[in-house]
């Protein structure tokens, strides 16, 4: 019996009807004792783990959209620094406003900056 290549197998699958593919899956379950749904769940797990591992983020000020004064005031209020410190941040875009913070902490900061007229991202 000739060895079946992946390419040949895929081409054969393309020619099958949905019913035939379902029957093939059932036959594979019986023959190998494998549940394809379990394999899909295992394959999806690494991506979910990466999302769960994202415990710290940074808030990045991307653009001032012509609202520089309002944004400088918002940055000053958020960081508790001086107007000059806030101005330095806003003058050098893109700029990290806060980093190594929890995603829950980043959302109010992002919202305040957006309300002031800024373009902001949480990374």
UniProtKB/Swiss-Prot annotation:
One GO biological-process annotation of the entry reads:
translation
Write down the InterPro entries for this protein, in alphabetical order.
Ribosomal_bL12, Ribosomal_bL12_C, Ribosomal_bL12_C/ClpS-like, Ribosomal_bL12_oligo, Ribosomal_bL12_oligo_N_sf
Give this protein's Gene Ontology molecular function annotations: mRNA binding; structural constituent of ribosome
Give the keywords, sorted: Ribonucleoprotein, Ribosomal protein
GO annotations of cellular component type: cytosolic large ribosomal subunit
* Intrachain disulfide bonds: none
Family, similarity comment: Belongs to the bacterial ribosomal protein bL12 family.
Under the subunit heading, UniProt states:
Homodimer. Part of the ribosomal stalk of the 50S ribosomal subunit. Forms a multimeric L10(L12)X complex, where L10 forms an elongated spine to which 2 to 4 L12 dimers bind in a sequential fashion. Binds GTP-bound translation factors.
Q: PANTHER family annotated for this entry?
A: 39S RIBOSOMAL PROTEIN L12, LARGE RIBOSOMAL SUBUNIT PROTEIN BL12M
Q: What does this protein do?
A: Forms part of the ribosomal stalk which helps the ribosome interact with GTP-bound translation factors. Is thus essential for accurate translation.
What is this protein identified as? Large ribosomal subunit protein bL12
Supply the gene name. rplL
């Amino acid at each position: 019996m000739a060895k079946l290549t992946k390419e040949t197998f895929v081409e054969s699958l393309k020619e099958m009807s949905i019913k035939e593919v379902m029957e093939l899956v059932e036959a594979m379950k019986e023959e190998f004792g494998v549940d394809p749904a379990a394999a899909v769940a295992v394959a999806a797990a690494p991506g979910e783990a990466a999302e769960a591992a994202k415990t710290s983020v940074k808030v990045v000020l991307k653009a001032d959209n012509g609202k520089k004064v309002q944004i400088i005031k918002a940055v000053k209020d958020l960081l508790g620094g001086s107007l000059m410190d806030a101005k330095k941040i806003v003058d050098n875009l893109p700029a990290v406003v806060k980093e190594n913070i929890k995603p829950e902490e980043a959302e109010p900061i992002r919202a305040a900056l957006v309300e002031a007229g800024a373009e902001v991202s949480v990374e």
